[in-house]
């Protein structure tokens, strides 16, 4: 039995140089494209949430309630954005685990661009976690940003600068919202570089053979 449909599909991809990988890859190689889908969902839902969100310590939580209750389909946007973030991390950890297991780290440029992406993603998620300004948001902002004080000489100055004062307050929330809004564009840029480098070098496969073997 020969799957001609699958063969023609692969041939089309190879014709346009869109498949820098052997045909022996497994399901574990799906998570890269799934991460791109997650990015698109997060950016679209995030944009609609940002329209109705208010970056003020007295109004932030109320604006979240307003999105859930009053904005048409706001509850879908909010839940999709929150659950989508968890899905994003599930996909990225599986993506990294596959890379570790099959030795993708040998492709240094792709691996380092991916590491940079993970750091930016974790920072973006942290800033987003703070935005509802609930009890846990306040606690997270205090604890995580306080880690900066461990840096010798510069720590206290850096923390004060990040907070916008001597304690977490309105300026902190405003800049966290600005960072949460701008960092996804850095993620898009780094993702483009990540994919460009991957297509330049070629992906790994379960056997560790050359990407152009077939």
UniProtKB/Swiss-Prot annotation:
PROSITE patterns (alphabetical): CYTB_NTER
The keyword Nucleotide-binding is annotated on this UniProt entry: no
Entry-linked InterPro entries: Cyt_b/b6_N, Cytb/b6-like_sf, Cytochrome_b_N_euk/bac, Di-haem_cyt_TM
Gene3D superfamilies reported for this sequence: Cytochrome Bc1 Complex, Chain C
Stored CDD domains: Cytochrome_b_N (cd00284)
TM helices/strands, residue ranges: 31-51, 75-96, 111-131, 176-196
GO biological process, one term: mitochondrial electron transport, ubiquinol to cytochrome c
Keywords: Electron transport, Heme, Iron, Membrane, Metal-binding, Mitochondrion, Mitochondrion inner membrane, Respiratory chain, Transmembrane, Transmembrane helix, Transport, Ubiquinone
Coiled-coil stretches: none
Topological category with respect to the lipid bilayer: Multi-pass membrane protein
Chain positions recorded as a ubiquinone binding sites: 199
Other facts: Heme 1 (or BL or b562) is low-potential and absorbs at about 562 nm, and heme 2 (or BH or b566) is high-potential and absorbs at about 566 nm.
The protein's role, per its UniProt record: Component of the ubiquinol-cytochrome c reductase complex (complex III or cytochrome b-c1 complex) that is part of the mitochondrial respiratory chain. The b-c1 complex mediates electron transfer from ubiquinol to cytochrome c. Contributes to the generation of a proton gradient across the mitochondrial membrane that is then used for ATP synthesis.
The protein's name: Cytochrome b
Lineage: Eukaryota, Metazoa, Chordata, Craniata, Vertebrata
Designated gene of the protein: MT-CYB
